[in-house]
């Protein structure tokens, strides 16, 4: 009988994997004469092989047509951002008109808060999770100060209440209920970046809206990682980056969702010419007439060269579907969890929740012995060509991505942990 935790079994799982050929669609950094064991797609996804051809297509069109490339050629730049719209909508569970690729995450967060954070004398507080990604916290604090409000009184942080530093739904519900009459906005992640915990966004929306608060989401670690249903959940807005699980390259164009109930609203916004309705944009009229839906929040014409790699990656998502990717992801992360518990339980503590519905692909790991030991292991892994990432003060994050990671990669990782522990 095959040992279910053996490398031979992992190799058999890889051979039987219906998605195994997707790995060939990506370029892997090299370690000596082999591919790196790349388990850091939660920080930067790998380059799709098709990305180079799509970037070259834009360069060729620029060289051949010059400015006319905006209106002629195989991919007109006037509407290039719409080439990724439908696929992005499928990834996040939205209607096509509810999404747009533009700017970057933090810029989009400020744009959304300018419209959806509408403080009054009685209702001006913003609720976030304690330990939120620093850029989100910076954005929230600065928005409060721009409105003449003090973060000390108007920024409410929900503290972790579970042993590993994660948050129960009960704690979130209690905070929303306790502060409900003061809340103007609940800003919540799809997945918490340090712990890897996934949240029930539909329930958070239900609780917040019952109190009269708007709801926005940072989906940086959720988009392309777990299935999302933003339209059905009723989120007011969401923002994300496309360089992690959506593999659009370093500093890639971000994404934004605005629920269709706001499509033709008179919400105040920070406006720019590319958000003006397309049919009359080039009349250059002084009055701003927003495009319906999320596109009405655009400022400038999109960076076409930066959108090209996103097109390449989204084609793979359309080819495969989030359901199939999620099924493999649960198996990969579950296998990693089993290996850690069976082979290195005295070395690694898993911080991320064990329930599959409360996590994505990432496991956040704390090394026994404290920060110095964690740094030592991280450096050992890097030297061995096994890439995760480090998050202060003491976590190693490992993210097996179903598009390109294998079950055997997880054995390589655990084997290197064992080698370090035995040294």
From Swiss-Prot:
Binding residues annotated for pyridoxal 5'-phosphate, in chain numbering: 105-106, 133-136, 218, 221, 243, 273, 301
Catalyzed reaction equations: L-kynurenine + H2O = anthranilate + L-alanine + H(+); 3-hydroxy-L-kynurenine + H2O = 3-hydroxyanthranilate + L-alanine + H(+)
Positions of post-translational N6-(pyridoxal phosphate)lysine modification: 244
Gene Ontology annotations of biological process type: anthranilate metabolic process; L-kynurenine catabolic process; L-tryptophan catabolic process to kynurenine; NAD biosynthetic process; quinolinate biosynthetic process
Keyword line: Hydrolase, Pyridine nucleotide biosynthesis, Pyridoxal phosphate
EC number(s) given by UniProt: 3.7.1.3
Assembly with partners or alone: Homodimer.
Protein name: Kynureninase
Organism: Xanthomonas oryzae pv. oryzae (strain MAFF 311018)
Gene, per the UniProt record: kynU
């Amino acid at each position: 009988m095959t040992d279910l935790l053996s490398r031979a079994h992992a190799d058999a799982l890889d051979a039987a994997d219906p998605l195994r050929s997707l790995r060939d669609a990506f370029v892997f950094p090299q370690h000596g004469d082999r591919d790196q064991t790349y388990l850091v797609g939660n920080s930067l996804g790998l380059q799709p092989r098709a990305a180079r051809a799509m970037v070259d297509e834009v360069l060729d069109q620029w060289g051949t047509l010059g400015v006319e490339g905006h209106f002629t050629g195989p991919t007109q730049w006037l509407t290039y951002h719409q080439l990724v719209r439908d696929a992005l909508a499928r990834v996040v569970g939205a209607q096509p008109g509810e999404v747009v690729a533009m700017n970057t995450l933090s810029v989009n967060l400020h744009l959304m808060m300018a419209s959806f954070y509408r403080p009054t004398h009685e209702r001006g507080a913003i609720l976030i999770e304690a330990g939120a990604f620093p850029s989100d916290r910076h954005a929230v604090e600065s928005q409060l100060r721009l409105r003449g409000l003090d973060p000390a009184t108007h920024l409410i942080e929900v503290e972790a209440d579970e042993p590993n530093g994660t948050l129960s739904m009960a704690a979130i519900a209690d905070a929303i209920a306790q502060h409900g009459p003061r809340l103007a906005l609940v800003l919540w992640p799809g997945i918490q970046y340090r712990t890897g915990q996934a949240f029930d966004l539909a329930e958070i929306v239900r609780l917040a809206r019952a109190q009269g608060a708007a709801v926005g989401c940072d989906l940086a670690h959720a988009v392309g990682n777990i299935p999302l249903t933003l339209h059905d959940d009723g989120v007011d807005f969401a923002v994300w980056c496309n360089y992690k699980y959506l593999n659009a390259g370093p500093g890639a164009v971000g994404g934004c969702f605005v629920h269709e109930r706001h499509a033709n609203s008179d919400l105040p916004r920070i406006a720019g010419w590319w958000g003006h309705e397309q049919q009359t944009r080039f009349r250059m009229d002084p009055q701003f007439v927003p495009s319906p839906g999320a596109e009405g929040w655009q400022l400038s014409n999109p960076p076409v060269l930066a959108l090209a790699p996103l097109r390449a990656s989204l084609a793979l998502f359309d080819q495969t579907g989030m359901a199939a990717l999620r099924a493999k992801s649960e198996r990969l992360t579950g296998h990693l969890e089993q290996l850690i518990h069976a082979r290195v339980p005295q070395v690694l503590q898993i911080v991320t929740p064990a329930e599959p519905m409360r996590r994505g692909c990432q496991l956040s790991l704390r090394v026994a012995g404290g920060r110095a030991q964690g740094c030592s292991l991280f450096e050992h892994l890097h030297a061995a060509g096994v890439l995760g990432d480090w998050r202060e003060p003491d976590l190693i994050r490992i993210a097996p991505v179903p598009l390109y990671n294998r079950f055997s990669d997880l054995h390589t990782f655990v084997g290197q942990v064992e080698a370090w522990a035995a040294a």
